[in-house]
């Protein structure tokens, strides 16, 4: 019997109906490689292997051992590359699509890593519902929604109740999808000079991420007050005010009321 480790935020999805819904929600992958974070009890992994070659990252050596045993018991060939490694250090040389039931405590960081990685072309993940809603909201209510919609489109697909897991978490989970869009990536990459497109895209994402942290540092305060506290951007405050005037927005505007952050950042960097 496998005992979930609280230190790794393990809650294993066991409900067959939700496992099937996740697999069926995958978009067409060819020619993308499919990457999974976390094998868990192997239930989702085996369903994926029935349809696709798969590479999966798992930090828990006990779960890796259990997964290898389950594969042997299946007595049929699977195309699985099982990597016993922390997914925070995931690095692929080929374009891929990411799928995972992410641990709550590290879900946001792993999603941001995938968004930042030019090789990742999209993701289908399950997180705490609150986190999923932050990524999928269509406006500029928070930094996460701005980041994801600057590089692609995020769609909330369905909720998963605590009863679908073992052990059950205290909150609902949600499955959401992100598909990156080349035209949006091109606009983000154009922010900074770099010899290669992927390098420019990654630097553009990191620059926008840093800027949004400053803008949303205190969401209830005005954008100007937040940037005054930022070592990196306080000297650009006059240019921010100029931009607001050009956009017919008041100086009292909050971060959540900015319509186009990429346009604002481009103005600050190049204007």
Swiss-Prot record:
PANTHER family: DIMETHYLADENOSINE TRANSFERASE (PTHR11727), DIMETHYLADENOSINE TRANSFERASE-RELATED (PTHR11727:SF7). The gene is rsmA. This is Ribosomal RNA small subunit methyltransferase A. Transmembrane segments: none annotated. It is found in: Cytoplasm. It catalyses: adenosine(1518)/adenosine(1519) in 16S rRNA + 4 S-adenosyl-L-methionine = N(6)-dimethyladenosine(1518)/N(6)-dimethyladenosine(1519) in 16S rRNA + 4 S-adenosyl-L-homocysteine + 4 H(+). It is an enzyme of class 2 (transferase). Its EC number is 2.1.1.182. S-adenosyl-L-methionine binds at residues 11, 13, 38, 58, 86, 101. One of its GO terms (cellular component) is cytosol. Keywords: Cytoplasm, Methyltransferase, RNA-binding, rRNA processing, S-adenosyl-L-methionine, Transferase. HAMAP family: 16SrRNA_methyltr_A. Gene3D superfamilies: Ribosomal RNA adenine dimethylase-like, domain 2, Vaccinia Virus protein VP39. It holds the Pfam family RrnaAD. One of its GO terms (molecular function) is RNA binding. Its main location: cytoplasm. Belongs to the class I-like SAM-binding methyltransferase superfamily. rRNA adenine N(6)-methyltransferase family. RsmA subfamily.
């Amino acid at each position: 019997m496998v005992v979930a480790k609280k230190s790794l935020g393990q809650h294993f999805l066991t409900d067959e109906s939700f496992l099937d819904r996740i697999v069926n929600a995958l978009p067409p992958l060819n020619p993308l490689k499919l990457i999974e974070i976390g094998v868990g009890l192997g239930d989702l992994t085996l369903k994926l292997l029935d349809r696709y070659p798969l590479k999966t990252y798992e930090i828990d050596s006990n779960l890796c051992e259990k997964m290898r045993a389950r594969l042997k018991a299946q007595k049929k060939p699977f195309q699985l590359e099982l990597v016993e490694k922390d997914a925070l250090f995931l690095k692929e040389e080929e374009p891929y699509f990411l799928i995972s039931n992410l641990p709550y405590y590290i879900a946001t960081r792993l999603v941001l890593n995938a968004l930042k990685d030019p090789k990742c072309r999209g993701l289908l993940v399950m997180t705490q519902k609150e986190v999923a809603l932050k990524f999928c909201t269509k406006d500029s209510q928070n930094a996460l929604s701005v980041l994801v919609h600057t590089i692609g489109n995020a769609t909330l697909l369905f909720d998963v109740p605590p009863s679908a897991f073992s052990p059950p978490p205290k909150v609902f989970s949600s499955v959401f999808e992100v598909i990156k869009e080349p035209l949006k990536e091109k606009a983000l990459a154009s922010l900074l000079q770099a010899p290669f497109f992927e390098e420019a895209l990654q630097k553009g994402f990191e620059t926008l991420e840093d800027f949004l942290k400053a803008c949303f540092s205190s969401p209830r305060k005005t954008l100007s007050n937040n940037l005054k506290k930022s070592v990196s951007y306080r000297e650009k405050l006059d240019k921010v005010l100029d931009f607001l005037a050009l956009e017919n927005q008041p100086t009292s505007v909050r971060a959540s009321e900015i319509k186009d952050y990429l346009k604002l950042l481009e103005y600050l960097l190049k204007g």
